[in-house]
Amino acid sequence: MVTVYVLLSIKDKATYVGMALNVLSRLKEHNSGKNRYTKAHMPWKIIYTEQFPDWATTRAKEKYLKSTAGKNWLKKYFDKN
């Protein structure tokens, strides 16, 4: 299973959307400063995950979550929860 995830910066409330086979391992990479964008906003915490059976479906969801419609959906999702 491949997971799409959303991270929230504890420092400045920035968000980051990505996908990985092992989300916890990927979170450690983000929090160790190995990614240029996420390094500036460390530390991060996982706020949303969703699993899919293949990379293509996961990539489509990631692309959606990065779109304006997806950002609006995430905002509504977290306003409810």
Located regions from the model:
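GIY-YIG nuclease catalytic motif and its immediate N-terminal context
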Residues: 1-35, 40-81
